[in-house]
A protein has these predicted regions:
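A structural detector for beta-sheet-dominated domains
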Residues: 33, 62-65, 186-188, 265, ...
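Polybasic, glycine- and aromatic-enriched phosphate-binding surface used to engage nucleic acids
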Residues: 102-317, 323-326
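Non-catalytic, mostly N-terminal accessory regions of nucleic-acid modification and defense proteins
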Residues: 31-36, 147, 207-211, 215, ...
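Generic structural signal for hydrophobic residues
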Residues: 16, 199, 274, 340-341
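Non-catalytic DNA-recognition/assembly elements of restriction-modification systems
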Residues: 89-93, 97, 103-136, 198, ...
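Amphipathic alpha-helical segments in well-structured domains
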Residues: 13-17, 255, 376
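A general structural signal for short secondary-structure boundary/capping elements
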Residues: 48-50, 64-66, 75-77, 232, ...
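Signature of N6-adenine DNA methyltransferases within the class I
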Residues: 1-131
């Protein structure tokens, strides 16, 4: 049976995974390293299920390059592939791309009560839904021309506006000078007739473009007031290419719904410590299993999936936050992982170097597989 690969990794398929694992003795999944259908970013798998077998129960995953390799596949290779123990739960099946030692390490970590999910220290929520970004999000030139500066706040609309693990006033000003749309129009919460002239003029312009007739705007009492305008402590990316990112907010900015907003639950742990702690091989490895990839190479997270990520937290440490931020801006993530893994996972949590190397390998294996599927 040919099915979408979402079977592996989405919550709404959880009951299907449980049914398959309970009903069949052995499940074989054949996957492709490259996308196999023209013109769509959809990953598919072949699902082969067997019932009432005497032995060798479980699940195995066989990878082939493309349809050509599938046509010439040696079925002995399939029969000789390792059959792994199948966890009869709602857990995602992405982990079965790993070998047995890697799977067992992840299971060991999940039962380690020292390592808690992100939800213990942060709430994650979606960003602002403006209803019409072209109207509400402005660049510096437009703001100046229409004299709207007093009626704006800072906003981030794309992940590439972030360069490091902190978004500060200097970053904002650079984006502003580049004429990026980093100003959000927020007129006073008043009826149109009582608004300042600059706001009335701009709102009138929006109505000539029929922006107020769009669904999201039309259901508001005052269409020009964007709801949920709170400023987060940090941002996490909804979609990532290389690795999951948590960015401290030091620019008093909010974000659109392409970027999730984070509130920290405690003042006992500094934002800098949380941001540094996020950059470790354990959290990165679990991110590839917790998030979802639909075939285009991008890893996607809903707020609840970020909250589920295991996040070991640094205790007292001497890691230089500014140095790590600089390395991230230089795209030297491996060097950052070396620094944080050494302090957090090895020194503080007493993981062995072999275990940390395995976790790094899991992240690289799964992220490499994901990004390799960007094209046929």
């Amino acid at each position: 049976m040919v099915i979408p690969a979402e079977l592996f990794q989405v919550k709404y398929a959880a009951e299907t995974r449980v049914f398959l694992s309970n009903f069949f003795s052995r499940i074989t999944i054949v996957t492709f390293r490259k996308l196999v259908f023209d013109d769509i970013q959809q990953e598919v798998v072949l699902l082969l299920c067997e019932k009432d077998l005497a032995d060798n129960h479980g699940i195995r995953v066989v990878e082939v390059e493309n349809l050509v390799e599938l046509e010439n596949i040696d079925f002995d290779i399939i029969h000789q592939s390792d059959v792994k123990y199948l966890d009869h739960s709602t857990e995602k099946w992405t982990k079965y791309f790993l070998n047995e030692d890697e799977i067992q390490l992840l299971r060991k970590i999940k039962s380690d009560n020292r390592i808690l999910p992100c939800s213990t220290i942060m709430d994650v929520d979606v960003g602002i839904v403006t209803g019409k970004n072209n109207f509400f999000m402005l660049n510096k030139e437009t703001v100046s021309e229409k004299k709207l500066m007093p009626y704006t706040t800072h906003v981030v609309g794309k992940s590439n506006y972030f360069k490091g693990i902190v978004y500060n006033e200097e970053d904002f000003q650079k984006n502003s000078e580049a004429n990026l749309p980093v100003y959000l129009f927020i007129p006073p919460a008043k009826d149109y007739a009582t608004l300042p002239k600059e706001c009335r003029d701009y709102i009138s312009y929006g109505e000539t473009q029929k922006y107020h007739e769009g669904y999201k705007c039309s259901i508001r009492k005052l269409w020009y007031l964007t709801p949920s305008l709170w400023t987060p402590d940090a941002f996490v990316l909804r979609q990532v290419g290389d690795y999951p990112k948590l960015i401290l907010n030091q620019a008093e900015a909010s974000s659109t719904d392409t970027i999730h907003r984070v509130r920290f639950k405690t003042k006992a742990i500094s934002g800098e410590t949380i941001a540094l702690s996020y950059l470790n091989s354990l959290t990165f490895a679990f991110s590839e299993i917790t998030g979802r990839s639909y075939g285009g190479g991008v890893l996607t997270f809903e707020p609840t999936e970020i909250e589920e990520l295991p996040l070991p937290i640094l205790g007292k440490h001497n890691i230089d936050f500014k140095r790590v931020d600089s390395l991230i801006r230089q795209r030297k993530i491996e060097e950052v992982l070396d620094i944080v893994d050494r302090e957090l996972l090895i020194k503080q949590l007493k993981f062995s170097e072999k275990e940390v190397k395995t976790l790094r390998g899991i992240w690289k294996k799964l992220s490499g597989r994901r990004t390799n599927r960007k094209s046929k």
